[in-house]
């Protein structure tokens, strides 16, 4: 079991100073975690969030320089609706790529027949399969192998492997300028060249277990979750520096992060609390908490932008949260139980794909009502599968967050 950290106070000012010093070479060993002690820094706690934060710009009309223009200011996912495939991906065969973290393999599934087409070896402990910002490459994050393995989505074949430290997760800045390797074990966000994957800057974070994140509507800031200390941390994307920190309640284990279509709030899955936090996108403030189920883990936006699908890994269910009402409106239970973890949605929006982390299987569910369409055996420890291709102009990373 991963170690939980009790209530921590963080000297954020020290971290900000450290974060300002860029590191131009690749680090060879683990960085020391930020100093822990009594702090008067802007660390806020859920329910008492009063400290200020460099505003993420949720309502800003100016996007991050170089970021593609938002086609609909009221819907950050407007370009990812059904059928809106980029010309880059239109010729790619529809596939589901499943990283098996305990077998060091990737399974390639046919989403029409629900059959496995191929299996190939990658590095040690693959965690997620991530589309590149330009949509041309899929990257497998080999966490313990300290490497990324490329997949050509035009052929479904394995490509080159490049050395990268501790790639638990992978994201891309909205302007495509940097790849962000989420180095959970090393407690930092590493900013890389998105093509060569050469390290450009390491940013230590003032919390433990950083593993998921999402970006504001204007692309100027990101919100990352820290599972082991129960924190959320804000980062200025252009400056690559920490700007704020929020402590959730005791026992919180925040996981996946997803921006609402209107860009006003973030939803944060909390495995420890069995639900989803609603976080103000403009300041470090908790707006609410929605109980969904044991082990709330992955978050996925429906193609029509009406619902947020929440995978409850501990009880084998999926909850639907209405973006309009910010309430849970339905719960689907996997027949016979399961351990739904990470995944994605088909290009037409009709099927929700999730891995069964502790059951060695993949679930395909009809989004029209939650009916289980298929239960597909895969390798051991399947984790962040990627459904590909998907609609959208560019990828922010993870298992396929496109805008």
Predicted features by range, described:
Residues 1-18:
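Sec-dependent bacterial lipoprotein signal peptides
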Residues 16, 21-403:
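Predominantly soluble domains enriched in secretory-pathway, periplasmic, or organellar proteins
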């Amino acid at each position: 079991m991963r170690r939980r950290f009790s209530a921590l106070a963080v000297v954020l000012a020290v971290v900000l100073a450290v974060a300002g010093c860029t590191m131009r070479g690749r680090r060879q060993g683990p960085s020391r975690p930020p100093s822990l002690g009594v702090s008067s820094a802007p660390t806020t706690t859920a329910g008492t969030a009063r400290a200020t934060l460099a505003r993420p710009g949720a309502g800003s009309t100016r996007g991050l320089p170089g970021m593609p223009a938002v086609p609909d200011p009221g819907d950050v996912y407007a370009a990812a609706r059904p059928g809106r495939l980029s010309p880059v991906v239109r010729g790619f065969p529809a596939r589901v790529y499943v990283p098996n973290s305990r077998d060091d393999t990737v399974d390639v599934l046919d989403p029409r027949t629900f059959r496995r087409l191929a299996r190939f070896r990658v590095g040690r402990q693959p965690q997620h399969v991530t589309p590149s910002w330009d949509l041309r490459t899929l990257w497998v994050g080999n966490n313990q192998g300290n490497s990324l393995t490329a997949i050509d989505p035009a052929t479904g074949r394995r490509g080159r492997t490049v050395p990268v430290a501790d790639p638990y997760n992978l994201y891309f800045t909205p302007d495509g300028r940097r790849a962000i390797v989420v180095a959970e074990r090393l407690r930092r966000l590493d900013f890389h060249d998105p093509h060569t994957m050469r390290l450009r800057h390491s940013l230590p974070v003032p919390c433990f277990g950083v593993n998921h994140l999402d970006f504001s509507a204007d692309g100027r800031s990101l919100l990352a979750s820290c599972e082991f200390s129960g924190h959320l941390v804000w980062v200025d994307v252009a400056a690559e520096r920490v700007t704020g920190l929020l402590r959730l309640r005791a026992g919180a284990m925040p996981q996946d992060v997803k921006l609402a279509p209107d860009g006003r709030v973030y939803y944060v899955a909390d495995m420890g609390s069995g639900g989803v936090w609603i976080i103000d996108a403009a300041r470090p403030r908790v707006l609410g908490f929605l109980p969904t189920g044991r082990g709330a883990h992955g978050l996925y936006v429906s193609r029509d932008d009406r619902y947020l699908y929440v995978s409850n890994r501990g009880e084998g269910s999926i909850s639907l949260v209405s973006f309009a009402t910010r309430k849970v409106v339905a719960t689907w239970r996997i027949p016979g139980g399961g351990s739904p973890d990470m995944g994605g949605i088909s290009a037409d929006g009709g099927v929700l794909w999730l891995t069964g982390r502790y059951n060695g299987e993949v679930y395909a569910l009809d989004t029209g009502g939650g009916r289980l369409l298929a239960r597909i055996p895969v390798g051991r420890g399947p984790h962040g599968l990627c459904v590909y291709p998907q609609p959208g102009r560019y990828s922010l990373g993870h298992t396929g967050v496109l805008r």
